[in-house]
């Protein structure tokens, strides 16, 4: 009786656990197989990108092809046959309907783009081989007269070319359009020379022209220089001073008493006060600071910014006095 109970409990617990482990193992193996396949695809693509001197040969990368997608292969064959009938290499439709793009697995966007490039490359090779077999003599003569076809590197496929014309507007094109224009243009100069010429023709150090304001549109621009700062208007004593040009940043070398004495001498000489002059103690420019103007020769350096409005010591004293309780 005890043995039958233990067997029943073991079967009830062990069988579901065993089935779950088997199912989990199957999913794990499938996931590992998928990871391995994706690692191989990424390694092939990275190897092709880092090869600078070789064209991306999709025949050497079978992992990039989706063998499980039979509908896509049939669509590619139809596309190539249509190209052969039309005889135009640039009429390859890239975008397909959703019904024609059904796949068993999810394909990323960059791999769909690579597959489209591989289809275009295969179609071009088939057309070239058929043209060579149909009229080989004409092809040989044309190839001898034509310039040598340049070798397309990986950078030519990945990096789009910039138009060398300065006046033309640079338009952003997709990777497929740039690859198509680069791969089909055999008479174009080498990529290195074209890149150098484009870099030399572009002006990277200039700025866009400044937009004129509405107030200055109808006003003629005069070629006159404007002063960097506006000085004070000449004071009453400008005609008495030896230098009429006032320098507001210069330390005055004359005291107020000297200016008053000059005004008195002017009055005594003429017998009447000069027109526009007033004898007062407010005449002239007086620098009120902590230094004495009369001993200016003994002062090594004066604080030009400490005057009657910015008397730091006086303001500090008044501020401290205002904090005291009254």
From Swiss-Prot:
Cell compartments where the protein resides: Cell membrane; Bud membrane
Gene Ontology, cellular component aspect: cellular bud membrane; cellular bud tip; incipient cellular bud site
GO BP field: fungal-type cell wall organization
Region (Disordered): 177-199
Membrane protein topology class: Single-pass type III membrane protein
Domain of life: Eukaryota
This protein's record includes keyword tRNA-binding: no
Keyword set, alphabetical order: Cell membrane, Cell wall biogenesis/degradation, Membrane, Signal-anchor, Transmembrane, Transmembrane helix
Extracellular side, ranges: 1-8
Segments crossing the lipid bilayer: 9-29
Coiled coil: none
Cytoplasmic domain ranges by topology: 30-326
First-listed, main subcellular location of the protein, grouped into a coarse class: membrane
Family: Belongs to the SKG1 family.
Name of the molecule in the record: Suppressor of lethality of KEX2 GAS1 double null mutant protein 1
Gene assigned in the entry: SKG1
């Amino acid at each position: 009786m005890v043995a039958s109970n233990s067997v029943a409990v073991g079967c009830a617990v062990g069988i579901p656990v065993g089935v779950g482990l088997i199912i989990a193992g199957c999913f794990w193996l499938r996931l590992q197989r998928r990871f391995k396949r994706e690692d191989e695809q990424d390694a092939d693509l990275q190897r092709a990108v880092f090869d600078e001197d070789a064209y991306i040969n999709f025949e050497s990368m079978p992992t990039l092809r989706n063998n499980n997608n039979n509908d896509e292969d049939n669509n590619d064959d139809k596309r190539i046959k249509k190209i052969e009938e039309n005889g135009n290499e640039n009429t390859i439709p890239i975008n397909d309907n959703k019904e024609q793009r059904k796949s068993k697995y999810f394909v990323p966007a960059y791999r769909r783009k690579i597959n489209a490039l591989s289809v275009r490359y295969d179609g071009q090779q088939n057309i070239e081989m058929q043209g060579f077999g149909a009229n080989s003599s004409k092809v040989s003569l044309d190839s001898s007269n034509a310039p040598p076809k340049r070798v397309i590197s990986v950078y030519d496929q990945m990096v789009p070319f910039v138009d060398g014309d300065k006046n033309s507007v640079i338009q952003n094109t997709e990777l497929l359009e740039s690859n198509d224009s680069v791969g089909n243009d055999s008479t174009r100069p080498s990529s290195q020379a074209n890149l150098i010429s484009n870099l030399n023709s572009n002006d990277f150090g200039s700025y866009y022209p400044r937009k004129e304001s509405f107030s200055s549109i109808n006003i003629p621009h005069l070629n006159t220089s404007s002063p960097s700062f506006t000085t004070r208007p000449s004071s009453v004593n400008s005609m008495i001073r030896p230098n009429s040009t006032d320098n507001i940043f210069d330390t005055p070398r004359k005291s107020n008493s000297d200016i008053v004495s000059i005004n008195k001498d002017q009055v005594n000489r003429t017998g009447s006060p000069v027109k526009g002059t007033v004898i007062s103690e407010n005449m002239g420019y007086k620098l009120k600071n902590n230094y004495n103007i009369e001993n200016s020769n003994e002062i090594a350096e004066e604080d030009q910014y400490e005057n009657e409005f910015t008397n730091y010591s006086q303001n500090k004293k008044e501020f401290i006095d205002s904090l005291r309780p009254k």
